[in-house]
Amino acid sequence: MRGPSIDWGIILLKPGETMADVDHGHHEVDETFYFVEGSGVMIVNEKLHNAPQGSVFLIEPNEIHNIKNNSEDQLKVIFIKGEYKPEDKYEC
């Protein structure tokens, strides 16, 4: 669901996949990730954080991030941004 006051959705990653080809950040918007099914790695400012099922991460503005499925099972993650600002995203 995108806009106007919230942006959220479900990310499905196959084994070995990443959320994006390159890490990215947001100038103004916080983003929350909830690892619903499977396990993976949350990458924040080039640091790797294990993310087993049930993990929650709050990514603040200007924190560079990505997600990788390093398991052998599908990874399902919910993302939530409090405001829909597609122009706020930048790649690194």
Language model features by range: what are they?
Residues M1-D23, V29-D30, I80:
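A short glycine-rich, His/Asp/Glu-containing loop-to-beta-strand
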Residues E46-P61:
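Short acidic-glycine-tyrosine-enriched beta hairpin
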Residues I11, F33, F57:
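Conserved GNAT-family N-acetyltransferase fold
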